[in-house]
Amino acid sequence: MKKQILQLNLEQTSSAAAEDTNLDCSLAGYDYVLPPERIAQNPAVPRDSSRLLVVNSQTTGKETPPLHQIFRDLPDILRPGDLLIMNNTKVIPARLYGRKSSGAEVEILLLEERKFNCWLALVKPGKRFKKGTQIIFEGLGMRNLGIENSPQYSVASPHQLTATVLETDKATGGRLLQFDLPEGQSLVQLLDKFGEIPLPPYITTSQAADEQYQTVYAEEPGAIAAPTAGLHFTPELLQKLRDRNINQAFITLHVGVGTFRPVEVEDVATHQMHEEWIEVPAATVAQIKATKAAGGRIIAVGTTVVRALEGAAASGNLQEFCGKTNLFIYPGYKWQVVEGLITNFHLPRSSLLMLVSALIGRERLLNIYQEAIASQYRFYSFGDAMLILPEARGVEQ
């Protein structure tokens, strides 16, 4: 069946829930103080040894506190017949270092390929990169070892890359770069030699290897950040889940730079969400519908999966989808597909924090975050996880 290629423009304008309506729509309502030492600089080893905070009741308080478990306990927490939906995107080595013809050093972050070997990129420093500026990139082997000693290079690989600035992108402030390569050769094929895996800006002292910032099921190159809720899974844990009839299905959402950008408008309902490319294949749609028909539950692994599934169901009916979405989920959103969520702990004032608030309520989520901080949980991309079970969500607004 030919895939339906669509362009979603799904800025949600639903009203917030009656309780705490003003704060639900106020940027200040999503603030909290995180001690810097709670920001994880390195991942848990092994992956599934990270902690898991489980929210499994409609209220959270002294009588019904969240459970504190280990991620590898997941097969005993979920039910046979549940379905985990995972994002199989793969982080590309999107950070490149180069220089202008004047010798001035340049750092760029590739955002997306607009057409063959023509990329939108953030450039630092960016003020003087006008149309026609040329940038020269040297491979990591040349920069670190000397090209003749680098095992990363084959005879067919170029020693340098050049790119020309075509224009400034007003929406992102980035530059459109045309890379000059031999006919038929793709920049993506050379990124392992010329680029580095970009880590989030709050990770400053990490010793993690590149593969530790990839999920074990990453297959589709295109992201500039990992879908971090999936970093906790190991092949052995996935097999244990399958052995208990807790199966997995996949979507693809290439995580973009917007995931790190804070919401800046005071009225969050007016926030303009960034676009991200998603694919929800027919096989995944079929698995979801079969799971629901059999009484199983749909558990999203990460906020990227939430956006993909809910975006694909924007018409009211989940369907195969391939295209872009700028879906913004915040309190008051009417859920279509997702019933439970595995997610890491998110930054204050972020759209991701608002998304999770839409599932269980803003005030309640912030109270859970305070308990996580007091209990020494590790936050953000390399941090611990939380599981919101369907029975924790309460009555839909």
From Swiss-Prot:
Key words of the record: Cytoplasm, Queuosine biosynthesis, S-adenosyl-L-methionine, Transferase
Transmembrane segments: none
Pathway membership, UniProt: tRNA modification; tRNA-queuosine biosynthesis
Subcellular location: Cytoplasm
Coiled coil: none
Pfam families in UniProt: Queuosine_synth
Catalytic function, reaction form: 7-aminomethyl-7-carbaguanosine(34) in tRNA + S-adenosyl-L-methionine = epoxyqueuosine(34) in tRNA + adenine + L-methionine + 2 H(+)
GO cellular component, one term: cytoplasm
EC annotation from Swiss-Prot or TrEMBL: 2.4.99.17
GO molecular function, one term: S-adenosylmethionine:tRNA ribosyltransferase-isomerase activity
Annotated InterPro entries: QueA (IPR003699), QueA_dom1 (IPR042118), QueA_dom2 (IPR042119), QueA_sf (IPR036100)
An example Gene Ontology biological process: queuosine biosynthetic process
Principal localisation: cytoplasm
Binding partners and assembly: Monomer.
Function description: Transfers and isomerizes the ribose moiety from AdoMet to the 7-aminomethyl group of 7-deazaguanine (preQ1-tRNA) to give epoxyqueuosine (oQ-tRNA).
PANTHER family referenced in this protein's UniProt entry, alphabetically: S-ADENOSYLMETHIONINE:TRNA RIBOSYLTRANSFERASE-ISOMERASE (PTHR30307:SF0)
Similarity-based family: Belongs to the QueA family.
Designated name of the protein: S-adenosylmethionine:tRNA ribosyltransferase-isomerase
Source organism: Nostoc sp. (strain PCC 7120 / SAG 25.82 / UTEX 2576)
Recorded name of the encoding gene: queA
